[in-house]
Each structure stands twice: as structure tokens, then as C-alpha cells.
């Protein structure tokens, strides 16, 4: 967006307005990655139009009982989340603190923009170390070009800046389905997810 201020919550409000403007009084929402955060915000805001949501990257704070006595699945999920925070979230730190600086660099360099995005496909997909095992080269380049041709490196990074500043993991009251795929960054158990998704 050209204007600043588009946090997860504002995007969720925009989706609700869009759906109603298109004539949908009731709808379902689904999302993964940032889409999961937006979809969760749609469910939390619960303006009456969203009947249910589905996310495939549920973000919820682990409750004390999970931290005190995790199941094997929960222990693995906690370990992966810890690894992510310590070893794999550097991109998130710079995007949430210096989005414009990063934006200028990526907008000025098509190779830099490509590396910034393809590295995420490498690390976050179930690709056995090579993104082209699961994505075509055209798919990868299409994704990169969405950012490059529109010069949206800075505005997309600002999503982190605006959303992390809010720090909101509001409770979701609408019916929710969650998929926890093997290579997902965050994979809460049911009791863990139920701390946020009611």
C-alpha cells in the first residue's frame, strides 16, 4: 500500500469491508504465513460476516502446562520455534525495525530481491534443500516479480513494522480449523492452539 499503517488488524478490517462490498454477508477465510495472521484477526474481530476460519500457521502463546510438561509433538514444536527465533528470524528483525532501509536495497537490486525471497522458499518448504524439488522455476520467479515489478519491498516489510508494534494475539471466537504441516514454522498442539482459538 502507498499509505502507511497497514497492520494485520487493518488488513483484516479491509477484507471484511471488501467481502461485504462484494455482496457476501457470510464468508469463510483461510490463510497461511501472514495470511494466517490476517485470517486470525478476521476471526478475532468477528464483525458478523465471517462464519469460520482455517489457518495453516496458527500462532498462539504456549500455556504453562505445555511448557511444564510438553508432549513429544509439543516438545518438537517448542524446539523448532526456539530454533527459528535464534537462527532463522533475522529477516523479521530487520523488517520490523528498519523496513525502509531494507526496501531501498531490495528495490535497487533484482538479484538481492530474488535472493531475499527464494531463501525463504529454501528454508520453509518441504523441498529437501532445493526449492525446485517442489516449485517450478516459473513459480519462484513469478513470486519474486510480484515484489520486483511493483517495487513493494519496503511496503511489504512495513507489515512487520506495523504488526509487531501492535503485538496483538487476540482471541478468536469463530469456529476454527488448523492444519499443522510437518515443515510449518509454528505447529501448536490442540491444547496449545486452544489458548487463542476458542
PLM regions and their residue ranges:
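Short helix-capping and inter-helix turn/linker motifs at the boundaries of alpha-helical repeat units
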Residues: 6, 91-93, 135
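Short aromatic-enriched loop/helix-cap "lid" or pocket-rim segments at secondary-structure transitions
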Residues: 2, 64-69, 189-191
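C-terminal subdomain of alpha/beta-hydrolase-fold enzymes, centered on the catalytic histidine
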Residues: 95-198
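Beta-sheet entry/capping signal
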Residues: 16-17, 25-28, 49-54, 104, ...
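Active-site phosphate/pyrophosphate- and oxyanion-stabilizing loops and adjacent acidic/basic residues
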Residues: 16-17, 40, 191
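The feature captures the conserved acid-bearing segment of alpha/beta-hydrolase catalytic domains
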Residues: 68-99, 169-171
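Conserved hydrolase catalytic core segment
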Residues: 22-78
Amino acid at each position: 500500500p502507498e499509505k502507511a499503517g497497514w497492520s494485520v488488524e487493518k488488513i483484516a478490517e479491509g477484507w471484511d469491508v471488501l467481502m461485504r462490498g462484494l455482496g457476501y454477508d457470510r464468508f469463510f477465510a483461510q490463510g497461511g504465513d501472514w495470511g494466517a495472521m490476517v485470517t486470525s484477526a478476521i476471526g478475532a474481530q468477528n464483525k458478523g460476516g465471517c462464519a469460520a476460519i482455517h489457518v495453516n500457521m496458527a500462532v498462539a502463546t504456549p500455556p504453562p502446562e505445555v511448557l511444564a510438561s510438553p508432549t513429544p509433538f509439543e516438545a518438537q514444536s517448542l524446539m523448532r520455534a526456539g530454533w527459528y527465533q535464534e537462527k532463522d528470524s533475522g529477516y523479521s528483525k530487520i523488517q520490523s525495525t528498519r523496513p525502509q532501509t531494507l526496501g531501498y536495497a531490495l528495490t535497487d537490486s533484482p538479484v538481492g530481491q530474488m535472493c531475499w525471497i527464494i531463501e525463504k522458499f529454501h528454508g520453509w518448504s518441504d523441498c529437501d534443500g532445493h526449492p525446485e524439488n517442489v516449485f517450478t522455476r516459473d513459480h519462484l520467479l513469478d513470486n519474486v516479480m510480484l515484489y520486483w515489478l511493483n517495487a513493494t519491498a519496503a511496503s511489504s516489510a512495513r507489515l512487520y513494522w506495523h504488526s509487531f508494534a501492535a503485538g496483538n494475539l487476540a482471541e478468536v471466537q469463530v469456529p476454527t480449523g488448523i492444519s499443522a504441516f510437518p515443515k510449518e514454522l509454528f505447529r501448536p498442539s490442540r491444547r496449545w492452539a486452544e489458548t487463542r482459538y476458542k
